[in-house]
Amino acid sequence: MTLLFDDFKSIVLNKTPLLDVRAPVEFKKGAFLNAVNLPIMNDEERHKIGICYKNEGNAKAVELGHSMVSGDIKEERIKAWIAFMDANPNALLYCFRGGQRSKISQEWLHVRGKEILRLKGGYKAFRTYLINKLSESTQHFKPIILGGRTGSGKTIVLEKMKNSIDLEGLANHRGSSFGSKLNAQPMQIDFENNLAYELIQKIEDGFKTLVFEDEGKHIGNAFMPENLISTAINAPLIILETQIDKRVEITLNEYVVQAQEAYLEAGFDFVLEEWSQSIQNAMKRIVRRLGNEKYTKVTAIFESALDEQKKSGSYDGYKEWAKFLLEEYYDPMYDYQIQKRSHMVAFRGDAQEVQNYIERLSDI
């Protein structure tokens, strides 16, 4: 069959659903946006067939594969593919290199009267396309960097701007010591793939200027591409200035209220216990930088707030905890870092002033 597809750009722009027939272990190492893993072989089957291929050659490996994936097992997998195709009529199929696994899957579906295009070159070719686009993307836009103290509401401002890219959202991390979320961060490969998707879409939309939050070389476990780091070094830095009371409110909402809701939605039986343990673990990680005396104090404030919530259901006690962390931990680090880059600051203002300035700078 020659039902091949290699218009990778259209996959990105249309956010095309993808049927990934690689083994689960391959999928976990890296996949694409809108891809669903419905493997033709599970990990154990793939391992055994790989050994056979190495020792006895391709023909024997294919023969073994057909014998292992047959009968009810084969039927269940084909049914899963058909169900996915029925729900996503424009779906595309891929394996690692666009070879035997996706071709055989395509043939099995053809026998059932279902036609699906497979990616030419498979995962490897599409991944190469995305990495190349990621590498050359900085040639097509000018960056603007949005900075500001922790809790100033930078993400809120970014969400209002069509030409922004939420790096913390892509990394599933808030970018601070307390920034980890309940769901695990994506693999580095997935982070890069998703970032490439975003950049391709924004550039295609005609944006010549893109706004990013001020980040370091990594966001949690996700490392920033070198070309973005080097481009951001000379970009204008816009500082969002927010009063401390508002910062406390934003921090309380993100790190306490929303975080606890996430634990509740995830089905944890002991929400406060699980959430508070994660906060206490995070505080232990900063004890060296914070100092023993301040660590003891902030821990006591947190435990008092936790007791108050258990008794009354109120979040108010956490305001003192958030304010202490902002002023005693985050702000000194911010002041030190921003002092070294003060010459890059192009503008300072509140949320509306910053948004207006960036829009003028972006010519939106």
Swiss-Prot record:
EC assignment: 2.9.1.3
An individual GO BP term: tRNA wobble uridine modification
PROSITE patterns registered for this protein in UniProt: RHODANESE_3
InterPro entries linked to this entry: Rhodanese-like_dom, Rhodanese-like_dom_sf, SelU
Catalytic activity: 5-methylaminomethyl-2-thiouridine(34) in tRNA + selenophosphate + (2E)-geranyl diphosphate + H2O + H(+) = 5-methylaminomethyl-2-selenouridine(34) in tRNA + (2E)-thiogeraniol + phosphate + diphosphate; 5-methylaminomethyl-2-thiouridine(34) in tRNA + (2E)-geranyl diphosphate = 5-methylaminomethyl-S-(2E)-geranyl-thiouridine(34) in tRNA + diphosphate; 5-methylaminomethyl-S-(2E)-geranyl-thiouridine(34) in tRNA + selenophosphate + H(+) = 5-methylaminomethyl-2-(Se-phospho)selenouridine(34) in tRNA + (2E)-thiogeraniol; 5-methylaminomethyl-2-(Se-phospho)selenouridine(34) in tRNA + H2O = 5-methylaminomethyl-2-selenouridine(34) in tRNA + phosphate
Keyword line: Selenium, Transferase
Active site: C95 (s-selanylcysteine intermediate)
Record has Transferase as a keyword: yes
Domain Rhodanese: 12-135
Superkingdom of the organism of origin: Bacteria
Gene Ontology MF terms in the entry: tRNA 2-selenouridine synthase activity
Assembly and interaction partners: Monomer.
Family: Belongs to the SelU family.
Protein's name according to its UniProt entry: tRNA 2-selenouridine synthase
